[in-house]
Amino acid sequence: MLNVLLRRKAFCLVTKKGMATATTAAATHTPRLKTFKVYRWNPDEPSAKPHLQSYQVDLNDCGPMVLDALLKIKDEQDSTLTFRRSCREGICGSCAMNIGGRNTLACICKIDQNESKQLKIYPLPHMFIVKDLVPDLTNFYQQYKSIQPYLQRSSFPKDGTEVLQSIEDRKKLDGLYECILCACCSTSCPSYWWNQEQYLGPAVLMQAYRWLIDSRDQATKTRKAMLNNSMSLYRCHTIMNCTRTCPKGLNPGLAIAEIKKSLAFA
């Protein structure tokens, strides 16, 4: 008789525990829907104006980054949504876009967990658009090519060894070589918006400075001459949007100031 009573009590405890677990699981899976308003424009429909399209994503079933939400939308709701992405870890710069009013990388931009706040996503500002969130970076890369971003020397070691660099000279490149050319800084700059055909912009100028101070490079005079005109460099008015928005925490504004200083005392 005692064994029967103990078994009944144990069964009741297990049943209550199971019900509590089920209740907790149900609460956990209560949808947490957040609205993402995404810029849409299709070049195949030139008469249609650009617009914001709303999508709802359950934050319980989505990764923590904005790129996770965009991928989920594309995979499950709208396969026509177009954007660039690759590494998903802030290295390649492909997923640069304007999120919540700020240029950044979608793969390292965390989603605000407040479901009541809508999140607006646009392509990088003041650029020609290929489709949806994809900007045309042709001019940006042409400008980068124009500064000749590679080591230039008139002579090399005769024995075929590498061109060595001291630890101190190598440290001068810190904060410059890490640039991933995502264009977040350049497309946040009003001067670049005004004339991106002639003003090189923060990203390209920072790379120009990177080669100007590389102790192994022997084209310093040529590089300075290329920049010493009224448009390529001096359209920078130290607005500093570039430094504030850089997703890698770099300081293009400082690099531009250093170029100006080097030209002033050349």
Curated annotation (Swiss-Prot):
Primary location group: mitochondrion
Pathway: Carbohydrate metabolism; tricarboxylic acid cycle; fumarate from succinate (eukaryal route): step 1/1
Record CDD domains: fer2
UniProt keyword annotation of Aminoacyl-tRNA synthetase present: no
Topological relation to the membrane, as annotated: Peripheral membrane protein
Cofactor annotation remark: Binds 1 [2Fe-2S] cluster.
GO cellular component assignments: mitochondrial inner membrane; mitochondrial membrane; mitochondrion; respiratory chain complex II (succinate dehydrogenase)
The protein's required cofactors: [2Fe-2S] cluster; [3Fe-4S] cluster; [4Fe-4S] cluster
Organelle transit peptide: 1-20
Subcellular locations according to the entry: Mitochondrion inner membrane
UniProt keyword Mitochondrion, yes or no: yes
Any matching Pfam family: Fer4_17
Further remarks about this protein from its record: Present with 9540 molecules/cell in log phase SD medium.
The name this protein goes by in its record: Succinate dehydrogenase [ubiquinone] iron-sulfur subunit, mitochondrial
Originating gene: SDH2
